[in-house]
């Protein structure tokens, strides 16, 4: 899907660590989130219409490309995320967006999830809808990945409690975007929200930062058995959730 969108100079924003092997039908059935959900939303928000085959063989043709369609009941959201229990999705109308023309990527050290939440609010206030990705990583994730995945290292070169990999972008050429990000991060560092930072200076450095994030599952497998989970929590509740969940895991 992403390649087809790129061929017509458009952008399909659903991006997953498993995007090299997953299929759009599975993404729809699980309502996958992805790395760009902070700006574009989860899979449900990227769909205009569906074609679905029910268990008795009937076909529901809802392949509309309209944002507003009052010709009947909108059953789309019943099937997205239902994991095939209500019917098999056989086709979909998907939303495409203008391709990002200017992208800035930063890898940041923060004290904890509370600081990360504060940083997200600041970046959103400074850039509007410019925050495309915002990934929180505990220290152990960076350590495991650097230890078990060839070609991956700690971008900051020294240990910190937690990290954020963030990206801001615009659909136009905007040479001022980097300065805006730098100014926001400088103020965050002055206020003690950000402890250290590195900004990608090239496409290769950007790819290296994202390789670290996307290689975390591979590092977990190499380190031994792990329990996979996918939990949705309101942003404001993340600090409390992390504190209670971490205590429960360590108990």
Where are these regions (language model features)?
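Noncatalytic alpha-helical scaffold of FAD-dependent oxidoreductases
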Residues: 1-251
